[in-house]
Every structure is written in C-alpha cells, then in structure tokens.
C-alpha cells in the first residue's frame, strides 16, 4: 500500500539502489525533484519502482533520468504511463551546469541512489556523483566488511563470557 519505510523525519523511501554503492565510489550526493504524471505518482505510492539500471545525464541544459522503471498503475486505463520513459529532474540551473562540468571533465557518472517522498509529499531523487569501482576495489570492500563482521562477532562472544 504505502512506500517501504518511514523514518522519524517523515521521509518515505520508495526504492533504494543498493547495487550502486557496490559498483561505484560515491563522491557527492544531490537532491532533485522529478517531473511525473498522475499515474506515476500513484504507482510510486504503492512502492512500484526499480532503480536497477537507472542513470542521469545532462541534455540540452536539462537533467534527465533514464531507465527508472515505474510500473503502470493497476487502476489506470488509457491514461496510464510508459514504464521506462525518460523523466526530467528538477534542479537549479547552476547546479546542473556544475554537475555537467564535473561529469565531462573527470569521467564521473550521475547515479540515482534512492527515490523517496519528502515530508511535504513530493517525490525526490537522491543523485550521486560517482566513479566506477575496479574489481579489486570491490574485493577489498568485501574483505573489509568480512573482517569487521568477524571482529564484531568475536567482541559479542567475549562479552557473553
């Protein structure tokens, strides 16, 4: 019925891109609004969205979001939306130009991390300026996570004694 989770501040997370943190080094995060149709908002309220292959790009001075899959609204009829259409992100012009310069210069990517409702009920996208990880970076992160897990487990066992 509603979105997945509600925090104490009133933010309701619709969908997370957990794979993005595994595939990319997140450098900075930004918040952007998103231009949606009525059936898209209703479908998002039901939690029917997927960020798996989504990315953002600056095109003709506007920030666009590609491959965000929002399932068609079940009660919608002939006015229903296309699931993977390109959607416009709402950001200040200066912010868009700054991001465009960073993406062009350094070979960075704009990846959506999550889609959520803010306390006022508006749909927002958290974008990350990110750089792709190499396979050895991924292995290093996995090894560090395993070592931390083992250390925590040992500390818990020691406290039980």
Swiss-Prot record:
Transmembrane parts of this sequence: none
Matches recorded under Pfam families: SmpB (PF01668)
SUPFAM superfamilies: Small protein B (SmpB)
Full protein name: SsrA-binding protein
Record's keyword terms, sorted: Cytoplasm, RNA-binding
InterPro entries, A to Z: SmpB, SsrA-bd_prot, SsrA-bd_prot_CS
GO cellular component, one term: cytosol
Main location: cytoplasm
Record function comment: Required for rescue of stalled ribosomes mediated by trans-translation. Binds to transfer-messenger RNA (tmRNA), required for stable association of tmRNA with ribosomes. tmRNA and SmpB together mimic tRNA shape, replacing the anticodon stem-loop with SmpB. tmRNA is encoded by the ssrA gene; the 2 termini fold to resemble tRNA(Ala) and it encodes a 'tag peptide', a short internal open reading frame. During trans-translation Ala-aminoacylated tmRNA acts like a tRNA, entering the A-site of stalled ribosomes, displacing the stalled mRNA.
Listed GO biological process terms: trans-translation
Source species taxonomy: Bacteria, Bacillati, Bacillota, Clostridia, Eubacteriales
GO molecular-function term, one example from the UniProt record: RNA binding
Location of this chain's protein in the cell: Cytoplasm
Family statement: Belongs to the SmpB family.
Superkingdom of the organism of origin: Bacteria
């Amino acid at each position: 019925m509603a979105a997945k989770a509600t925090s104490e501040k009133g933010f309701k997370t619709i969908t997370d891109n957990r794979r993005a943190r595994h595939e990319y080094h997140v450098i900075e995060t930004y918040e952007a609004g998103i231009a949606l149709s009525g059936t898209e908002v209703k479908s998002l309220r039901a939690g029917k969205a997927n960020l798996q292959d989504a990315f953002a790009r600056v095109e003709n001075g506007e920030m666009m979001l590609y491959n965000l899959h929002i399932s068609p609204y079940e009660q919608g009829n002939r006015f229903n939306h296309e699931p993977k259409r390109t959607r416009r992100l709402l950001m200040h012009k200066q912010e868009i130009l700054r991001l465009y310069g960073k993406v062009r210069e350094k070979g960075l990517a704009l990846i959506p991390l999550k889609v959520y409702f803010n306390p006022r009920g508006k749909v927002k996208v958290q974008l990350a300026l990110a750089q792709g990880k190499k396979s050895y970076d991924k292995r290093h992160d996995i090894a560090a996570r395993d070592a931390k897990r083992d250390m925590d487990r040992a500390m818990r066992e020691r406290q039980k004694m």
